[in-house]
Amino acid sequence: MGKYIVKRVILAIFTIFIISLITFFAMNAIPCGPFNSEKAKSPAVMKELEARYGLDQPLIVQYKNYMAGVLHGDFGVSLKTDRPISDIIGESFPISAKLGLLAALTAIVFGVVLGSIAALMRNRWPDRVIVFFVTLITSMPSFVIATLLLYFFCIKLGVVQAFSSGSNMILLPVLSLSLSPMAYITRLTKTSMLDALGQDYIRTAKAKGVHQYKIIFVHALRNALIPVITYVGPMIGGILTGSMVIESIFNIGGLGSKFVSCITNRDYTMIMATTLFLAVIMVGANLITDIVYKVIDPRIKLD
């Protein structure tokens, strides 16, 4: 187990290094520079700006200086606002983290519950309703769901104030982000639950007179949750990427909307920092998921 964790940590660090390398050189390969705008600047001004931000140095030197700063928690400054990027991330990430955490918890809790109900009431009307819901939701991307929710609640019902938290709505963005992973977890739980209920140890437990409650929640559900756990890592990645659009739609000042804005404004240092920051979260989430997966089911051999 210890060797596996060390191996995965090394692989995670290498992955983040490759992402930083690709992001850095991709940003520098873009023909249009960060200081180009509709209002032309003189060569002297451009030269002064490049010298100020160290963009006049060789790319290898720039990358070395950039990574040296990152390792000390310094992502540099925004080329558009001249603010420290660490401060911008520190202000906006808690908003995205709250939104993402609520969406993930909603997806997991309701997905497991609905999937279990569908499995236990297979081929009956609750199962058919849940399957219809899953099929409908999985066919729509999150931004379409967000648009429909806005139209229904805000325009048709006019109850936008009932779902506000401070200056930002929280329920509708959480629903927009959680419905797609919730549908997938529902389908995954149902399949795993049906498979678990058909195993020999379940039949043995029933033959011994074990209470139905214990059979379902202690034996069947516990094993059915293992595939769900493996999905948590990719789900977090999906929620992070989906939040970029959702935060823009609902005008939430989280890290996702900041990322979209910095792309629009060609704020290259902000793009690199945000990409690297989100990559660390996604790689870390997948690493933790794999370790928890191994702990829950020691029979699984991970290379």
Question: Model-found features: residue ranges?
Answer:
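Membrane-water interface segments at the C-terminal ends of transmembrane alpha-helices
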Residues: 23-30, 68, 132-161, 178-180
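An internal, D/E-rich "acidic patch" concept
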Residues: 55-112
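Generic alpha-helical secondary structure signal
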Residues: 44, 58, 62-66, 70, ...
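Membrane-interfacial helix-loop-helix junctions in multi-pass membrane proteins
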Residues: 51-60, 75-85, 163, 185, ...
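Alpha-helical transmembrane segments of integral membrane proteins
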Residues: 2-3, 93-126, 142, 165-303
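Short, hydrophobic secondary-structure boundary micro-motifs
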Residues: 36-38, 61, 76-79, 145-147, ...
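Hydrophobic alpha-helical transmembrane segments of membrane transport/permease proteins
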Residues: 15-64, 157-172
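N-terminal signal-anchor/signal peptide hydrophobic helix marking the start
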Residues: 6-16
